[in-house]
A protein has these predicted regions:
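Conserved small/polar residues in nucleotide/adenosyl-binding loops
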Residues: 425-427
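Juxtamembrane extracytoplasmic/periplasmic/luminal helical "stalk" adjacent to the first N-terminal
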Residues: 37-39, 44-128, 142-150, 214-219
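Extracytoplasmic/periplasmic ligand-binding sensor regions of membrane-associated signaling proteins
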Residues: 138-237
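Conserved beta-strands of PAS-like sensory domains
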Residues: 165-167, 176, 211-248, 270, ...
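Cytosolic signal-transmission helices at domain junctions
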Residues: 68-76, 401-423
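Intrinsic low-complexity, intrinsically disordered coil/linker regions enriched in small/polar
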Residues: 165-166, 203-207, 226, 242-352
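Membrane-interface helix-start motif
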Residues: 36-37, 67-70, 243-248, 365-385
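Positive-inside N-terminal membrane-insertion signal
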Residues: 1-52, 411
Length: 427
């Protein structure tokens, strides 16, 4: 019993101490809050400072959140546009391959080609026969080529020697370097659409002249004998500016967005939307009908040429842009943090490499345009922030003036009180 009583007294004592501590803590908190409240009421200048600090924090947090959201949406938009462009391009390239295969497997075409190729160990003995076969091929291919916008053709045997062609100067040649890459793949049984390259024969330009080294490309399909062995190739000539580049031009958006294709050497194989600007920058020759296709390398000039910067080294010695260097390695990526393009302008972009066609495709837009809404928001905030700072300074100055007047009034009151006390003492 005695132990129980001592325990109860101890419990009551502990409870009393706890209550005492809580009361003390509450009183301390209350006094602190009271002093803080009095300070804030007395020192009015502190409110604008607090508002500035809070606004700065909110602005910083909001900008980060908005920038993150914008980058996410921009990344998604660039990737979607690139995917659509690549899908359209791959569909078009597949159609070209299907067209070439269809003609290479045509009975009439195969019969003419078999006569040109001859049986193993034999050659065409009479030029008249070869010329007649050439005319027959021209007649058989003409309707198909016209309906599908092909501008020429050639046929080779298995040794890659050209046996017939719409351009007679090609017949008999087996040393055209530009043709060797895709012909080698065709002899392995592939149907190949070549990237655009400079023509080795004359092509009619807009002025009506025939010019060499104009952009051209070929779709080439294997020709098989009755045992399904590859015995030759049929190549159909395409003008890339008619459909190939037009598909990519559909990927332009805004004032600076563009989609373009390029080869393994970093040369653009479609047109840039900035051809006129590139002439003024000296990146393209100032000539009639000057175009960027096959003339412009995607190299980083190390500075913004549109702002007056000029590199002090040859363009061939400049590195590829970040995008091009990544793509030619076979990589696909999106960059919304910014990198320099072939003009030296900071851009954001998405890119991919299409290995079966040996070309890369990129979609880019100027960084300034992509983040223009964020820049407008940021400028608006800084204007408001500056106005708030001016208000804070004005209130701070007003508070100092009020505080000085208050001190002077208090001093005058004290002096008056002292004078009154002295007067009463004399009385």
């Amino acid at each position: 019993m005695m132990k129980l009583r001592r325990f109860l007294r101890g419990s009551r004592s502990s409870s009393s101490h706890a209550v005492g501590h809580m009361t003390f803590a509450k009183s301390n908190v209350g006094r602190t809050m009271s002093r803080a409240g009095s300070f804030l009421k007395r020192e009015l200048w502190i409110w604008p400072v607090i508002a500035v600090l809070i606004l700065a924090f909110v602005a910083f947090w909001s900008r980060r959140a908005i920038e993150t959201t914008m980058k996410s949406n921009l990344e998604s938009g660039l990737q979607t546009l690139l995917d659509v462009e690549v899908a359209m391009l791959e569909t078009w390239l597949s159609v070209q391959a299907s067209n070439a295969e269809s003609m290479a497997n045509s009975y009439e075409i195969r019969e003419c080609i078999y006569q040109l190729i001859g049986e193993p160990g034999e050659t065409i003995s009479e030029l008249k026969d070869a010329a007649e076969i050439q005319r027959q091929l021209d007649r058989d291919l003409a309707p198909f080529m016209a309906s599908h916008d092909y501008v020429g053709y050639f046929i080779t045997d298995k040794t890659k020697e050209i046996l017939a062609a719409s351009h007679s100067e090609l017949v008999g040649r087996d040393d055209v370097r530009e043709y060797m890459a895709f012909l080698s793949r065709v002899m392995e049984g592939e149907t190949v659409v070549s990237p655009p390259f400079e023509s080795v024969v004359g092509i009619k330009v807009a002025s009506g002249e025939l010019r060499q080294q104009q952009p051209t490309m070929y779709v080439c399909a294997p020709i098989r004998n009755r045992n399904f062995q590859v015995v030759g190739a049929l190549a159909l000539q395409i003008r890339p500016e008619r459909e190939f580049t037009r598909i990519l031009q559909l990927g332009r958006f805004g004032d600076s967005g563009e989609t373009y294709a390029f080869g393994k050497d970093g040369r653009i194989v479609s047109n840039s939307r900035f051809d006129d600007d590139l002439i003024l920058l000296g990146l393209l020759p100032d000539e009639e009908e000057s175009q960027s296709i096959l003339k412009l390398q995607i190299r980083d000039p190390l500075g913004d040429m549109t702002a007056g910067y000029r590199p002090n080294i040859r363009r061939a010695d400049l590195p590829l842009t970040k995008m091009a260097a990544s793509a030619v390695e076979g990589n696909s990526a999106v960059d919304v943090n910014g990198y320099r393009d072939y003009r030296g302008v900071e851009v954001v972009g998405a890119w991919t490499w299409i290995p079966e066609f040996e070309i890369g495709v990129a979609t880019e837009v100027d960084y300034s345009q992509a983040f223009e809404p964020l820049n407008i928001l940021q400028r608006t905030f800084w204007i408001l922030f500056a106005m708030l700072c001016l208000c804070a300074l004005a209130i701070f100055g007003f508070t100092l003036i009020v505080a000085r007047l208050r001190r002077e009034a208090q001093k005058a009151a004290v002096e008056a009180q002292q004078l009154g006390q002295i007067g009463r003492a004399h009385v």
